[in-house]
């Protein structure tokens, strides 16, 4: 929760979904099409391997969703990912497709209406990763850095990590 944001977060009193990286969402009358409007001007932090050249956008949402959903995605097996929660809540079977409408709109087509769909995007498994970082690390041959040295939009950035010893964060300067 300190490194990443998600499309929605939860109201601390009512425990209902509220805007986070998505500023609003619209649901079709049949409940099977969800369109999210994304917050503009959101910056990813940087690390010793990567400095972002663009703001958060729809490409990052697609990267984060497809990594979990598509077994052919280049990041699906990185760090031995099995995405248990994504599968346990049934998103792999619920989501028919996800597409970028434009830089700040993402649309999900569902196989059937689902009352929990919105709340699922506030869970930790739904953290939004940088597609640009993923692409850069893939080109360098070090895709595991996306998991080992995370880059997010959350309030903090990873400064140092020592296995079984220390994790040090710094405030995200953005």
Task: Identify the residue ranges that each predicted region occupies.
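Aromatic- and charge-enriched surface segment that lines or borders ligand/interaction sites
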Residues: 23-75, 107
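N-terminal lobe/hinge region of extracytoplasmic solute-binding protein
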Residues: 1-29, 66, 151
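Second-shell loop/turn segments in exported
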Residues: 42-52, 94-96, 146, 157
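Residue-level signal for nonpolar/aromatic packing positions in well-ordered secondary structure
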Residues: 7, 24-25, 47, 108, ...
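Surface-exposed binding/hinge segments that line
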Residues: 37, 62, 69-135, 160-162
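A structural "hinge/loop" feature
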Residues: 1, 21-22, 48-54, 115-127, ...
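Bilobed "Venus flytrap"/periplasmic-binding protein-like clamshell domains
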Residues: 149-174
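Envelope-exposed proteins and targeting segments
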Residues: 3, 21, 30-34, 38, ...
